Curated annotation (Swiss-Prot):
Top-level taxon: Eukaryota
Name under which the protein is recorded: Late embryogenesis abundant protein 18
Entry keyword set: Coiled coil, Stress response
Coiled coil (residue ranges): 34-63
Length: 97
């Protein structure tokens, strides 16, 4: 169940990232069209690349958060706890045997 939730969250993050990249490309294209000099066009292209890289970094960050959530909320089988449920050694006082 948790892995399915993680996959769905990852798919949502991927869709959001693609929208952000598409928006950055459209905005960059508009800026390049409005630019008059080669220098302005180059600056617009650099801003477009920067926004795309930021969107990809956000995707990786959200995927890491989803993976961390999956580890925190991991399912334990009954009787298989992560801590000892009883004493593991002999319960006799030293020197009594």
């Amino acid at each position: 169940m948790q892995s399915a939730k993680e996959k769905i969250s990852d798919m949502a993050s991927t869709a959001k990232e693609k929208l952000n990249i598409g928006g950055a490309k459209a905005q960059g294209h508009a800026e390049k069209t409005m630019a008059r000099t080669k220098k302005e066009k180059k600056l617009a292209q650099e801003r477009e690349k920067s926004k795309e890289a930021q969107a990809k970094a956000d995707l990786h960050q959200s995927k890491a958060e989803h993976a961390a959530d999956a580890q925190v909320h991991g399912h334990h089988l009954p009787g298989h706890s992560t801590y000892p449920t009883r004493a593991t050694g002999a319960n006799y006082p030293p020197g009594q045997i």
